[in-house]
């Protein structure tokens, strides 16, 4: 398995499985001198960790991160940052019945065919449990981006099943268990999830993430365009089946006169492009959305097959999220932060001495 790292100048490598002893990651390329401690990472990990509300999995993991290397006297040293989170609430017996069964919609079959064996306990490496380390690494990137460059990243659940946010109030996002920005829809969300959980089914979701304060110039055309790298990072999150930048698939119904973001010395009149033009950041807010499938870990019986090729019926036991989009908000923030951090360092390496005579503009 060779796809465990992301980034070129800011490199994040994760390791570990859902029911293994621990999860871990190595961060290479973080500049020295950044004030950093475990509490900086723990805040985002607590937002992602399981067992925090009745709408998510009942698995209870403290997700307490330990710094193994790369930080001395409260500051990064410029060497590799080693992080680890121990798994403490595994119940591997919940998965003994699927040892030789393939759960439809999961990675069981493809992992078996690719590697010739698989860790069936909670999905092993394919489990979203792995994303805890992405969130920890993303918190390091977020700290640097905000402290050094004034860049802030905020994510939210913009749609759960048929329920969409009509307004986006960032002050509401951390005030409810859904990370939802529209207070008027919270009761509707609660009722919907209660019925869904009772039925034993699951539902999909849409998560949005916005980065403000991003300077002009990030992105490396042609193959490492900023939007391409963001899409790559977000698409690598478990259960993501679609990524949009700016208006995304909505551009299909737009005319050129509608979609183009008119500009003047006072700034851009709109942001249909999502803050990226020609693969390079424009200085506007970067806006991305991800579509997340409903998890296949449900208690409703489904047809499948055994590892020996026999027909079988599968009922997934264990503790699972009825909507994976809820806990994906800090994960999406982390992945966007990692990409922006990497591209800031790449841009600085090549273009630090560039001095354009054209004035920078933002949103009007």
From Swiss-Prot:
It catalyses: 5-O-(1-carboxyvinyl)-3-phosphoshikimate = chorismate + phosphate. Its cofactor is FMNH2. SUPFAM superfamilies: Chorismate synthase, AroC (SSF103263). It comes from the Bacteria. InterPro entries: Chorismate_synth, Chorismate_synth_AroC_sf, Chorismate_synthase_CS. NADP(+) binds at residues 48, 54. PROSITE patterns: CHORISMATE_SYNTHASE_1, CHORISMATE_SYNTHASE_2, CHORISMATE_SYNTHASE_3. Reduced FMN (FMNH(2)). It is an enzyme of class 4 (lyase). Keywords: Amino-acid biosynthesis, Aromatic amino acid biosynthesis, FAD, Flavoprotein, FMN, Lyase, NADP. GO terms for cellular component: cytosol. One of its GO terms (molecular function) is chorismate synthase activity. Belongs to the chorismate synthase family. This reaction introduces a second double bond into the aromatic ring system. Homotetramer. This is Chorismate synthase. It comes from Shewanella sediminis (strain HAW-EB3).
């Amino acid at each position: 398995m060779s796809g465990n790292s992301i980034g070129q100048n800011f490199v994040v490598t994760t390791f570990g499985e859902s029911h293994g002893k621990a999860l871990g990651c190595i961060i290479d390329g973080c500049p020295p001198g950044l004030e950093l401690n475990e509490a900086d990472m723990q805040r985002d990990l607590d937002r992602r960790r399981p067992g925090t509300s009745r709408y998510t999995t009942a698995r209870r993991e403290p997700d307490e991160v330990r710094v193994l290397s790369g930080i001395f006297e409260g500051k990064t040293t410029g060497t590799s940052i080693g992080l680890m989170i121990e798994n403490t609430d595994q119940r591997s017996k919940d998965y003994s019945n699927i040892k030789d069964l393939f759960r439809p919609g999961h990675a069981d079959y493809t992992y078996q065919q690719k590697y010739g064996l698989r860790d069936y306990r909670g999905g092993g490496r394919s489990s979203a449990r792995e994303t805890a380390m992405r969130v920890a690494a993303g918190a390091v990137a977020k700290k640097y981006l905000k402290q050094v460059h004034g860049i802030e990243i905020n994510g939210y659940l913009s749609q759960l099943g048929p329920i969409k946010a009509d307004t986006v109030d960032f002050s509401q996002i951390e005030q409810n268990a859904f990370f939802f920005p529209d207070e008027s829809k919270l009761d509707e969300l609660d009722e919907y999830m209660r019925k869904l959980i009772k039925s034993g089914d699951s539902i999909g979701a849409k998560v949005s993430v916005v980065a403000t304060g991003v300077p002009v110039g990030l992105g490396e055309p042609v193959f490492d365009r900023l939007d391409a790298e963001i899409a790559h990072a977000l698409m690598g999150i478990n259960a993501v089946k679609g990524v949009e930048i700016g208006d995304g698939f909505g551009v299909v119904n737009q005319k050129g006169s509608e979609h183009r973001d008119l500009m003047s010395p006072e700034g851009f009149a709109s942001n249909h492009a999502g803050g990226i033009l020609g693969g390079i950041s424009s200085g506007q807010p970067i806006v991305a959305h991800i579509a997340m499938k409903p998890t296949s870990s449900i208690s409703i019986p489904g047809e499948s097959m055994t590892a020996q090729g026999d027909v079988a019926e599968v009922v997934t036991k264990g503790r699972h999220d009825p909507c994976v989009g809820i806990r994906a908000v800090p994960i999406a923030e982390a992945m966007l932060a990692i990409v922006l951090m990497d591209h800031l360092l790449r841009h600085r390496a090549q273009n630090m001495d560039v001095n354009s005579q054209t004035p920078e503009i933002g949103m009007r």
